Amino acid sequence: MTFTTESTSTRFSNPYLSTVETSDSVASVTAQIKRLSTDDQLALLWYVYTEMGTSVTPAAPGAARLQLAEGLLNQIKAMSFAEQLTFMRDLANQVDTADTRAYGILSANTKLAFWYQLAEWMRQGIVVPMPADYSASTDAYQTLEALKQLDMGQQITVLRNIVIEMGVDPLFA
């Protein structure tokens, strides 16, 4: 039997190509999320954490270190719903405030766990809930569908990419 590049490429997967495709998918969905409006980004995060939260949190090693964000989380609990929404929008828009700087110093995994906690509190009515009449854009729905097509590890990478860039890192401000 003779081997050609055609016969071997159909029989054996190329781990280098699949890695490129994987990183391209993650980068593509991350870019799609970043292009959404602030409120669509927040809605997408809320949906992902409420629908996939049980899968996301155990996979985020920083969840055990959420006590590092406890002070900021307690401040958020004490805010009015309007102030909470402003804070979340400020995070997404990287507005420089004391609270967004406090978030900015958290580790990537602690930021993942932080957003999970916010989603839990939204579900419990402690943090401003998703408005009942909120209607996400077509782009947000398409982005959510693209995110759903990724495997769990890729989804967590996309979420990490998004939450890492939120807030203001005081070391780089």
Feature annotation, model-predicted:
Residues 2-173:
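Short amphipathic alpha-helical interaction elements located at domain edges
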